[in-house]
């Protein structure tokens, strides 16, 4: 009994140990199952996400295909041109109560209870309704509109960008124009809403739609616009050197009649219609013409007490006016003067400048291969003193062959004032040099020290030395020897062929030499040596330039008139380190000057 009681605790402990092992094994099994369930749940979640994405993509694709099928079944939209707008108007409403745009485009005398528009569609003119989503105020005549299958306007589009090019011949009221098209066919077109807000002039090129009868767009005519420069030049008389007497003569002829018209009327005087500036090339004819326009604007502003008065300078590129088609050059001349009259209609001064006038208006009957001058010259004459007056318009012509211009243009009453722009003498050359060589330029320190560090004294001395070298008559400056028909001969020097353009080129050369010295030696500033070297190089460069094939023509262009020249000997001076000077003989040849 005692032994059995002693073994009982041992059996209980063994039994409990077995139960713990069983529970531990069951726990491990359940934990493994839980892990498997978590993995299965994660895989299911991932598959569910993929399934959701796939379903959404399929739904979007189904909607896209459905929309495409619906569009494929829609009726096509049509395009039409808007001809007229008919706003809503009651029977008792007067036309005057409508806006200006509605009065111009609405059907007068009819009661319009619903908003509608007239369109040009497939060769027919139709009146159609508008969608409630279309604002009638946003539409304008000539505009393209979009029509649905029931021919209702559902949208307003832009203006057609293509069409037939026509030229405006005459304006009819404010909304129509008489135009010429192909083969000079004339027709009346309406101006579209886009053109109604622009200023249309005679001669303008328009793009027109022949189906609707509307002019849609203004097209720049580059072949005409490029010939005319309407900018007001910023060149004044102070920018021109060596032409004091000529400038005074021009100011008396141009500015006095424009600034004091009452005095001229009181004395029975008329303002000159034109000025001819003639002389050798490069002496300032174009500069003077630009200064005239600038001065007229400044004087008019002073007279009227204004800060600024507009003036216009129409610079006509003479040779580019010529056209191979008969009548085109005359048309361009008419357009130029129509533009000038338009600009001058408000009292502004307009200068019409014909450069190289001899290329356009040659003496009639002198043409070798053509006779275009027989119609171009009369066209200019009719514009200058024709039926239409040229008030506030001044014609200025420039030429270095005034002998080739038709005498009818040069007579009094047309080009009244004739101003000869001569080659500059030594005093005029110094004045021109002073316009380009100023105290603002960097001057070399050695030259400044030689004149007491005075920039003005240095510049004056530099100009004086340069002019003396340019106008010396020693052997180094001999240029040409001419022989006249009477047997006399004359030596011409470099100074006899000097011009303002040559002087400017000399200064530019000197500046370039100063820059090269600064880059190579580090010495900064312009020196007298640079100016003298520039004069010598300019002279040497022009030794082979004079074309003396025809001595008479060469003499006219070079401003050597008088006794007929029969023989020219070109003198070539040797450069430093090269062979000494020599002469080239030129025999008489009747060829043209080219």
Swiss-Prot record:
PROSITE patterns: AAA. Residues 593-594 are annotated as: Docks into pockets in the proteasome alpha-ring. GO terms for biological process: modification-dependent protein catabolic process; proteasomal protein catabolic process. GO terms for molecular function: ATP binding; ATP hydrolysis activity. Residues 18-71 form a coiled coil. Residues 1-20 are annotated as: Disordered. Pathway: Protein degradation; proteasomal Pup-dependent pathway. GO terms for cellular component: proteasome complex. Keywords: ATP-binding, Chaperone, Coiled coil, Nucleotide-binding, Proteasome. InterPro entries: AAA+_ATPase, AAA_ATPase_domain, ATPase_AAA_core, ATPase_AAA_CS, NA-bd_OB-fold, P-loop_NTPase, Prot_ATP_ID_OB_2nd, Prot_ATP_ID_OB_N. Homohexamer. Assembles into a hexameric ring structure that caps the 20S proteasome core. Strongly interacts with the prokaryotic ubiquitin-like protein Pup through a hydrophobic interface; the interacting region of ARC lies in its N-terminal coiled-coil domain. There is one Pup binding site per ARC hexamer ring. Upon ATP-binding, the C-terminus of ARC interacts with the alpha-rings of the proteasome core, possibly by binding to the intersubunit pockets. Consists of three main regions, an N-terminal coiled-coil domain that binds to protein Pup and functions as a docking station, an interdomain involved in ARC hexamerization, and a C-terminal ATPase domain of the AAA type. This is Proteasome-associated ATPase. It comes from Renibacterium salmoninarum (strain ATCC 33209 / DSM 20767 / JCM 11484 / NBRC 15589 / NCIMB 2235).
């Amino acid at each position: 009994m005692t032994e059995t009681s002693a073994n009982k605790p041992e059996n209980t402990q063994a039994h409990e140990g077995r139960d713990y092992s069983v529970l531990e094994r069951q726990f491990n099994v359940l934990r493994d199952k839980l892990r498997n369930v978590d993995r299965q749940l994660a895989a299911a979640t991932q598959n569910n996400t993929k399934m959701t994405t796939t379903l959404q993509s399929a739904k979007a694709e189904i909607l896209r295909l459905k929309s495409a099928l619906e569009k494929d079944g829609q009726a096509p939209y049509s395009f039409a041109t808007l001809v007229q707008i008919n706003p809503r108007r009651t029977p008792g409403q007067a036309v005057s109560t409508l806006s200006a745009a509605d009065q111009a485009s609405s059907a007068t005398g009819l009661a319009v209870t619903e908003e509608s528009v007239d369109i040009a569609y497939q060769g027919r003119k139709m009146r159609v309704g508008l969608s409630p989503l279309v604002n009638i105020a946003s539409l304008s005549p000539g505009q393209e509109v979009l029509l649905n299958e029931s021919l209702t306007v559902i949208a307003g589009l832009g203006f057609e960008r293509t069409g037939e090019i026509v030229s405006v011949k005459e304006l009819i009221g404010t909304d129509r124009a008489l135009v010429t098209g192909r083969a000079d066919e004339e027709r009346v077109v309406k101006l579209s809403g886009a053109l109604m807000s622009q200023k249309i002039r005679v001669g303008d090129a328009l793009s027109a739609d022949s189906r609707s009868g509307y002019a849609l767009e203004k097209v720049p005519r580059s072949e005409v616009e490029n010939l005319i420069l309407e900018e007001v030049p910023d060149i004044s008389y102070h920018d021109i050197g060596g032409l004091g007497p000529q400038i005074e003569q021009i100011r008396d002829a141009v500015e006095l009649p424009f600034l004091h018209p009452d005095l001229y009327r009181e004395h029975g005087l008329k303002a000159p219609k034109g000025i001819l500036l003639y002389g050798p090339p490069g002496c300032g004819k174009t500069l003077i013409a630009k200064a005239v326009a600038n001065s007229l604007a400044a004087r008019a502003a002073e007279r009227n007490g204004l800060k600024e008065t507009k003036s216009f300078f129409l610079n006509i590129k003479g040779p580019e006016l010529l056209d191979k088609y008969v009548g085109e050059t005359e048309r361009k001349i008419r357009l130029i003067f129509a533009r000038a009259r338009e600009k001058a209609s408000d009292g502004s001064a307009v200068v019409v400048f014909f450069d190289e006038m001899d290329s356009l208006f040659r003496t009639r009957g002198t043409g070798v291969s053509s006779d275009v001058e027989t119609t171009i010259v009369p066209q200019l004459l009719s514009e200058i003193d024709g039926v239409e007056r040229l008030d506030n318009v001044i014609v200025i012509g420039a030429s270095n062959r005034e002998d080739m211009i038709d005498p009818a243009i040069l007579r009094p009453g047309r080009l009244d004032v004739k101003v000869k722009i001569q080659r500059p003498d030594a005093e005029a050359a110094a004045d021109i040099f002073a316009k380009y060589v100023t105290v603002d330029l960097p001057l070399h320190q050695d030259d400044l020290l030689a004149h007491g560090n005075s920039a003005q004294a240095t510049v004056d001395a530099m100009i004086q030395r340069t002019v003396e070298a340019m106008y010396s008559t020693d052997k180094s400056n001999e240029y040409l020897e001419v022989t006249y028909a009477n047997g006399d001969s004359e030596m011409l020097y470099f100074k006899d062929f000097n011009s303002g353009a040559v002087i400017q080129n000399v200064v530019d050369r000197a500046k370039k030499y100063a820059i090269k010295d600064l880059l190579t030696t580090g010495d900064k500033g312009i020196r007298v040596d640079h100016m003298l070297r520039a004069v010598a190089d300019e002279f040497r460069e022009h030794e082979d330039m004079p074309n003396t094939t025809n001595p008479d023509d060469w003499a006219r262009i070079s401003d050597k008139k008088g006794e007929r020249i029969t023989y020219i000997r070109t003198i070539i001076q040797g450069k430093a380190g090269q062979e000494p000077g020599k002469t080239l003989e030129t025999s008489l040849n009747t060829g043209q000057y080219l």
